[in-house]
Each structure stands twice: as C-alpha cells, then as structure tokens.
Amino acid sequence: MQAASLAFHPPALRTSPSYLSSKLPHHLNYSLFKHAPSTSTLSLTQVLSRNTICKPPAVGKYVREDYLVKKLSAKEIQELIKGERNVPLIIDFYATWCGPCILMAQELEMLAVEYENNALIVKVDTDDEYEFARDMQVRGLPTLYFISPDSSKDAIRTEGLIPIQMMRDIIDNDL
C-alpha cells in the first residue's frame, strides 16, 4: 500500500493588474469610509434625546449628555444628604483614570434606568473633591455609599467593583 501525499498545493495567486483593477472599483463602492453628503437635518440632541419618567436632580451636571447619573459637588451632596428624600441616595466616588470606576459607571447607569423612580444615584469625582472624599474616608476606588431616606438607618459603604446584583440587593433589602 502506498502512502498518500499530504502536500498542499495552493491555487495560483491572481495578481495580474487586470484582475485587481476589475475588483478594486467594486470594493470601493462599499467602503465604510466613503463620504456621502448627508441629506438629514436632525440635530445631535434630537438623535440622543431620552424620555425620562422622573426628573433628575436639579443641581449638578451630567457626565455625558445622555446619562442619568449626575456628577455633583461636595456642597450639593451635603445638601442632598441633609434634605428630605423619599428614595435612597447612592453616591459613587470615582476618578476618571480608574478602570474599575468606568466599569462601575456602566452598572450604575443600568441601575439608574432600572430604579429611576426608586433611587437617586449621583457621582463625585475624587480628583475635583479631594477634601470631601478624604472626609468621607474614601480610601479605594470606586467607593459607594448607600444612604437610606430613613435617618435612623446607617449608611452602607462598599469599596471596589461590586456586582450589579449586590447593589440591587442592598437597595431592595437594606435601605
């Protein structure tokens, strides 16, 4: 019995100029980078607008235009804590350079949509509010404070990246 040859012989490469030129114009017609003049007159705010069920806090500014979680100053946070609330307050201490903080921001946005009427979620940039972060004993990032509307309950503090389900459990069961 004779051994079969396992040698692979690739087909001849088609590198003739006529073959390439016949394929090139067709390829350019479907290019992702081809610029076509736009006939649409929609503004960016019309495209990115989102309908919200409840109003976000009147103070502070959004990290991005389409986010529900607002970035607040230390003074604004202190007013929220001292003021009357019907819903729990979740404060996220973060930094723009912190990788886990970016991941946590995505989870907090999902929570903000999910608990839109039942919780208030805000952010504090620790680089902008260094003294406030120090006073709140923020040692690692991200740090979350879960503050109940009931002043007799203690605040819950977490440090580091935590799963979204753990945040749900804290909001639903402990606040």
UniProtKB/Swiss-Prot annotation:
Q: Which PROSITE patterns match?
A: THIOREDOXIN_2
Kindly list any coiled-coil regions of this protein: none
Which SUPFAM superfamilies does this one have? Thioredoxin-like
Residue numbers marked as site, Deprotonates C-terminal active site Cys: 92
- Keywords from the named record: Chloroplast, Disulfide bond, Electron transport, Oxidoreductase, Plastid, Redox-active center, Transit peptide, Transport
Identify the residues that the record assigns to the Thioredoxin domain, covering every copy: 74-175
- The protein's site described by Contributes to redox potential value is found at 99-100
The record's subcellular location field reads: Plastid, Chloroplast
What Gene3D superfamilies has UniProt attached to this entry? Glutaredoxin (3.40.30.10)
- Superkingdom, natural source: Eukaryota
- Biological process (GO), any one: cell redox homeostasis
UniProt transit peptide range:
1-64
Q: What is its EC number?
A: 1.8.-.-
Principal location class? plastid
GO MF, any single term: protein-disulfide reductase activity
| Protein role | Probable thiol-disulfide oxidoreductase that may play a role in proper chloroplast development.
Q: How does it assemble?
A: Interacts with Cf-9 resistance protein.
The entry assigns this protein to a family as follows:
Belongs to the thioredoxin family. Plant CITRX-type subfamily.
**Name this protein carries in UniProt:** Thioredoxin-like protein CITRX, chloroplastic
Point out the gene that encodes the protein: CITRX
